[in-house]
Design a protein with these regions (language model features):
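Alpha-helical secondary-structure segments
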Residues: 128-135, 179-185, 233-234, 262-264, ...
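Structural transition elements
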Residues: 352-392, 402-408
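Extracellular/periplasmic solute-recognition and catalytic clefts
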Residues: 238-249, 266-324, 348
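Extracytoplasmic/peripheral linker and loop segments enriched in polar/acidic and small residues
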Residues: 37, 335, 347-348, 423-435, ...
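Long beta-strand-rich cores associated with HINT superfamily self-processing modules
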Residues: 524-550
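N-terminal lobe/hinge region of extracytoplasmic solute-binding protein
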Residues: 55-106, 137, 228-231
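Aromatic- and charge-enriched surface segment that lines or borders ligand/interaction sites
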Residues: 100-151, 183, 276-279, 327-329
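Gly/Pro-rich hinge or "lid" segments in bacterial periplasmic/extracellular proteins
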Residues: 158, 169-171, 175, 179-180, ...
Length: 550
């Protein structure tokens, strides 16, 4: 985060921005805040009113917790809703949230959660255990077709209900014996369950509010709009102006409302990181979502106290569509694309050492020893790194998100593949929504992609490439891989479980439907008067814990 010394600020009445988004925001923001005096920046005026101004990179696709799939959507959703648990930002360990305690049976198959007695929806209605039961049944309903339903598959009969094998949702392994108790019965032991329960797909929804707008499994209904959304988190939805701003107001019904100093949060969907950095310098943001790598050195030299480079449990990789081109159906071709990549050079020259090169999909975490692709030297020595003889050589397309980093990484890969393999690769830049859609529909050959851990366990990365995973957009499927993860799921001894996960990762890297590139880092600018901004390896923060310095 940039250390600010004598950076120039635009006075409040004549805000200057570099895009129509920021111009629209500057005008709208003045209506949200209580006004600002001459020479006062939006950040200064916002601080006086307890308003936090945040860059958030992209317009939300959906604020339905059961349907959201992007980090930028879920950052907002996590402020609107709350599950049974929440993860500590720094340690990633589960903490009590809607539940104040829980216990597990000796066989690891039955978990009992005890809800707090002071839970309310934002409209004042009491929130009880039955709300969680109905919400999880909704998330698993095949009519909703929620991609994230798979996170609930640890529940007994969840897969059977989601697949239509059974029709009665009461057979799913969750019951509410009373208003403040939830009993979860699992298909297999899941020691990571308390962390898993912090994900948005496990959040409760106000059933009557959903049904007011039609069947609760209908998508795109207006219950997620301002004035209609009923939530249970620290904030409520006050304003949603598409492509301009989302404003959250403190929820007075939340159990910890009295302790939250941040009264209001304004999220700005500024997709261009250069525009976002300029907005920060102009005093329009308390914190950016990211920072162009080309600006890191400048901020390190001139304003290091405002520059934050924090570890992120995130993996960036090349996604290969094995069904998109005959050459890509060959594992030898995919391995050649991977081994032609000089990851050290990529990290040093393109990423300016802000990210670590990756030779595995899973970042280092806990007691897990990640698998690793072979070194380039070893692969070339045994000949497995050569491009299979294809006449003519394939001409491939690489799709990337149009941010400040992916195109630069793509250009480096393009040059490496041309030099090492003699193949031509074109680069197509896309805005985030289209970039995601083309991966989902298989409309790509090569793609730069990334995954941020949902919970602190290797499985959060490895389960992406199960044959039936809704996020396995590679066209690759392996019964052996599926079997290894299934064995790990039923293995209670920690070391043996991790060994099976490592074996699965080794198989994945050898088959190469993906090629690891580098591990993520959260690179931001944070205004000096924001207190309690701690590293968050999973990318989420409880904004209600932040404070404004005097």
């Amino acid at each position: 985060v940039l250390l600010r010394s004598r950076l120039m600020h635009s006075p409040c009445p004549t805000l200057q921005s570099t895009s129509s988004v920021l111009v629209g925001f500057a005008v709208a923001l003045l209506l949200v805040l209580n006004g600002c005096t001459p020479r006062e920046t939006p950040v200064e005026a916002a601080t006086r009113s307890g308003t936090l101004l945040l860059g958030n990179a992209a317009e939300p696709a959906d604020l339905d917790p059961h349907l959201s799939s992007t980090l930028t959507d879920q950052i907002i959703i996590n402020s609107l809703f709350e599950g049974l648990t929440v993860l500590d930002e720094a340690t990633m360990q589960p903490l009590p949230a809607a539940a104040d305690s829980w216990e597990v049976s000796p066989d690891g198959l039955t978990w009992t959660f005890h809800l707090r007695h002071d839970l309310h929806w934002s409209n004042g209605d009491p929130l009880n255990a039955a709300d969680f039961v109905r919400s999880w049944q909704r998330a698993l309903n095949p009519a909703l077709a929620a991609d994230n339903a798979w996170y609930l598959f640890v529940l007994k009969n969840a897969i059977a209900y989601n697949s239509g094998e059974i029709a009665n949702p009461a057979e799913i392994g969750v019951t509410a014996p009373d208003a403040h108790t939830l009993v979860l019965t699992l298909e297999h032991p899941a020691p990571y369950l308390p962390a898993l329960l912090s994900l948005p797909v496990w959040f409760p929804l106000h059933a009557d509010n959903l049904e007011k707008f039609g069947a609760h499994t209908q998508r795109g209904r207006p219950w997620t709009r301002p004035g209609e959304l009923i939530s249970n988190g620290s904030y409520t939805l006050a304003v949603w102006e598409p492509n301009a701003r989302i404003v959250l107001e403190k929820n007075p019904q939340h159990r910890d409302a009295a302790h939250a100093q941040v009264q209001r949060i304004v999220f700005l969907p500024i997709e261009n990181p250069d525009d976002e950095e300029r907005a920060y310098r102009a005093g329009q943001l308390h914190a950016t979502f990211t920072l162009p790598v080309t600006k890191i050195t400048t901020w390190q030299k001139n304003a290091a106290a405002q520059l934050r480079i924090d570890p992120l449990l995130q993996s960036h990789f090349l996604r290969i569509n094995t069904a998109a081109h005959p050459a890509l159906a060959d594992a030898a071709t995919r391995r050649a694309l991977s081994t032609a990549i000089d990851r050290e050079l990529l990290a040093r020259s393109v990423l300016q050492t802000s990210r670590a090169p990756a030779t595995s999909l899973v970042p280092p975490m806990g007691d897990y020893l990640p698998a690793s692709i072979q070194s380039e030297a070893a692969i070339r020595q045994n000949g497995s790194g050569n491009m299979p003889h294809v006449v003519p050589p394939p001409k491939l397309e690489l799709i990337v998100r149009n941010d400040s980093l992916m195109p630069r990484v793509a250009e480096a890969l393009q040059a490496m593949w041309k030099t090492q393999l003699g193949i031509d690769v074109s680069i197509t830049q896309l805005e985030q929504k289209t970039w995601v859609q083309r991966q989902q529909t298989g409309d790509y050959q090569l793609c730069l992609s990334a995954w941020t851990a949902d919970y602190p366990d290797p499985l959060t990365f490895l389960e992406l490439f199960l044959s039936d995973s809704p996020y396995n957009w590679t066209g690759w499927a392996s019964r052996d891989y599926d079997a290894l993860l299934a064995r790990a799921a039923h293995t209670s001894e920690p070391a043996a479980r991790l060994a099976l996960l490592r074996e699965a990762e080794t198989l994945l890297l050898d088959e190469a439907p993906i090629a690891p590139l580098y591990f993520g880092a959260e690179t931001r600018l944070v205004y000096p008067n924001i207190k309690n901004w701690t590293p968050a390896p999973l990318g989420f923060r409880r904004f209600q814990l932040l404070q404004f310095a005097d």
